[in-house]
A protein has these predicted regions:
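RNA pseudouridine synthases
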Residues: 1-326
């Protein structure tokens, strides 16, 4: 199936925002060791947070879930190896900004500069509205090597062969990001410690950074002040590890939440609100300072998987973050 044309605009094009027509999809989840002995409703509310518990119970009552082909109920227990299938009756993917540009292309890899509202991988309600789908339609089988959150703009690398993907994954990279944060960030900080679950947050996936910590996942981020504004700061972040939400959680825990971040910003209840209601109000966005999180993948340096040549790519700060600098 082809993505809608002309949704994709490449170098020199204008961003395109377009809804994909309704498609019939079955979403399957294979139960692994981590979810063994969980109830169906526990799995749905923990792993798929774009609906609240009431929303998932309505879907279950409507008969939209099966376990290995048999009707599922909320309290059914899932065992390792089972398959939970979701047969949504009205799945419409939210609109996103489908714009991306190809910065470099050869037979081994692609370097992509993506918009700040484009999921990379299929997950939850997103399938056709993903960078993976758009690129796979054009280039065939692809292997994203470094991932960015939906609302993180900028550079990422996609391998075009399994061999290139393996070599790139094994290589050491240099990654630099720009983050616009609340408050005045004035000193260079080598933030080395650990990331653990933030048990004080109602959002289970939220993490917090512990400086010098040894429990959880080890992480290290070099944070450097780039420019100060009246109420915000532009911070350059250089990664030495690549943990989930590393920059966002680290800056939040240090007292510098990202502008526009629903989860690691000024109020994480806005993350829950958007998950339940599907959108936020203009007042909410005014509070956040931007409609998406102000994080941009600005510099990537790596070795080409076939030639061994060092390659460096730069992406300028996008206009929406520039407008939010104040």
């Amino acid at each position: 199936m082809k993505p809608p044309s002309p949704a994709v605009s490449e170098k020199g094009g204008e961003p395109g925002i377009q809804a994909v027509p309704l498609h019939v999809r079955v979403i399957a989840t294979r139960i692994d060791r981590r979810c063994h002995n969980w109830s169906v409703i526990q799995l749905l509310t923990t792993r798929f947070t774009y609906r609240d518990e009431g929303g998932w119970r309505e879907r279950l009552a409507a008969g939209e879930f099966t376990i290995d082909g048999n009707p599922a109920s909320p309290e059914d227990i899932l065992l390792e190896g089972m398959t939970l299938q979701y047969h949504p009756s009205d799945l419409q993917e939210p609109e996103v900004d489908l714009h991306y540009s190809v910065c470099y292309e050869d037979d081994a890899l692609l370097v992509i500069d993506k918009s700040g509202d484009l999921p990379v991988h299929p997950a939850g309600v997103f399938y056709y509205h993903t960078l993976w789908y758009l690129l796979a339609e054009k280039y065939g089988t692809i292997h994203p090597v470094n991932r960015l959150d939906r609302e993180t703009s900028g550079l990422l690398v996609v391998a075009r062969t399994p061999d290139a993907a393996a070599k790139l994954a094994a290589d050491s990279w240099q990654k630099e990001y720009f983050a616009l944060v609340h408050g005045h960030f004035t000193e260079v900080m080598d933030a080395e410690g650990s990331l653990v679950r933030d048990t004080a947050s109602p959002v289970r996936r939220k993490r917090k950074y512990i400086h010098g910590g040894t429990e959880g996942e080890s992480c290290r981020t070099l944070l450097m002040p780039e420019q100060l504004f009246q109420t915000h700061s532009l911070v350059k972040a250089k990664l030495f590890t690549g943990r989930m939400h590393q920059i966002r959680a680290t800056l939040y825990s240090l007292g510098y939440p990202l502008v526009g971040d629903k989860l690691y910003g000024v109020d994480d209840t806005l993350f829950i609100k958007r998950a339940k209601e599907g959108s936020l109000t203009e007042d909410d966005y005014q509070k956040l300072g931007m409609k998406r999180q102000a994080l941009h993948s600005a510099v990537l340096t790596f070795r080409h998987p076939e030639t061994g040549q060092e390659m460096t790519f730069h992406s300028p700060l996008p206009e929406d973050i520039r407008r939010a600098c104040r």
